[in-house]
Amino acid sequence: KETMPYLIYDENPYTVVTEDGKTVWVLDAYTVSSNYPYSQYTAIEHDGIKEKINYIRNSVKVIIDAYDGTMKFYVTDKTDPIAMAYRNIYPTVFEDINSEIPEDISEHFIYPEYLYNVQAELLKIYHNVKPDVLYRTDDVWSLAKYNATNVTKSTGTELKPYYTMVKENNKNEIGLVQIYTPESKQNLISYLVGTTDGNS
């Protein structure tokens, strides 16, 4: 955070063991803004601070050597103007723009839970594709609950997203899953799965 304080960092870094036996930490970093035109605001919390944003992208990965603490900042989404601006301002902090994260690390990437939670919250309303339904809020979802005592009443504790093995393109991958119900009801209506392609 002291090296690049302009990014928001995920609270759940994870370790990866490379092919040569080294252990590295993978830390997801986000660019955010509250000035993106024609975009819905949402509230986030980081470092004990609450703020409203309408733009967030997981455009930077930080690879940290678990032994000596060496940090490497990679821009994984070169279409993000904010990340590219930071890279141009601080060229010595980031790896070369053409540098790729080693495959023995990138193949173990998982979908970042912080970004997923922001997306999952917005999907409760913005799953609608019909403008009239969207503006009338006729079809709003809720996060599924457990320990609910009534099938028609919104009680119980919200079921948080969880990592599990999912099958995609005939391949088993680690994915994040969030289950939805219609608002104030307890029957499953949809679920959101987050997986990564190994590049970002």
Protein language model regions, located:
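Accessory, solvent-exposed terminal regions and/or long lumenal/extracellular loops of proteins
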Residues: 82-200
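Exposed beta-strand-loop-beta-strand "reactive/processing" segments of non-cytosolic proteins
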Residues: 6-63, 136-184, 189
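Extended, regular secondary-structure scaffolds
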Residues: 1, 23-27, 41, 48-53, ...
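Acidic/polar loop patches that form or flank catalytic/metal-binding clefts of enzymes
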Residues: 7-12, 71-74, 116-117, 200
